[in-house]
């Protein structure tokens, strides 16, 4: 089995531990500059790290809900349902020195893939790390499609198991800032 690895993000300004089987989507298609996107080699799971403008008009768990609903709007979700929102313990984060508050949200969105009519429920886990000194909301998303959506999980592909919530938590807690200049001049 392929080990987890520390991966540079945003040109080395950040790094994080990615789970086994993570493929950098920017090697396959264009990805916006404010995002790092990774997909599982076998399943349809994906991990997204986004640098977003701080949404100072929402605070606490409402900020996590705001970003979840915003993602639903961008994806033209037919239904958006928040299941849980909980604070993240800052001491567990590599970014604890610059993260003022952090939230983890789990929910479902009913979305149709590109060029498909049928919308299916996808489970999303999101971590919101708020960095007000950089005017930034860092949003990490773990997309978990339903099992029947997962690409060919035959015996030949069992060497790379589907990602777990633990893999996502490792990404969130290991995310490290190396170069604050990514946020522009202070």
Swiss-Prot record:
Residues 27-70 are annotated as: Interaction with RAN. It is a peripheral membrane protein. The keyword Disulfide bond does not apply. GO terms for biological process: heart contraction; protein transport; regulation of membrane depolarization during cardiac muscle cell action potential. The keyword Thylakoid does not apply. GO terms for molecular function: guanyl-nucleotide exchange factor activity; small GTPase binding; sodium channel regulator activity; transmembrane transporter binding. Keywords: Cell membrane, Cytoplasm, Guanine-nucleotide releasing factor, Membrane, Nucleus, Protein transport, Transport. It is found in: Nucleus; Cytoplasm, Perinuclear region; Cytoplasm; Cell membrane. One of its GO terms (cellular component) is nucleus. Pfam families: Mog1. Monomer. Interacts with RAN, both RAN-GTP and RAN-GDP. Competes with RCC1 for a common binding site on RAN and thereby inhibits RCC1-mediated nucleotide exchange. Forms a complex with RAN-GTP and RANBP1. Interacts with the cytoplasmic loop 2 of SCN5A. Belongs to the MOG1 family. May regulate the intracellular trafficking of RAN. Promotes guanine nucleotide release from RAN and inhibits binding of new GTP by preventing the binding of the RAN guanine nucleotide exchange factor RCC1. Regulates the levels of GTP-bound RAN in the nucleus, and thereby plays a role in the regulation of RAN-dependent mitotic spindle dynamics. Enhances the expression of SCN5A at the cell membrane in cardiomyocytes. This is Ran guanine nucleotide release factor. It comes from Bos taurus.
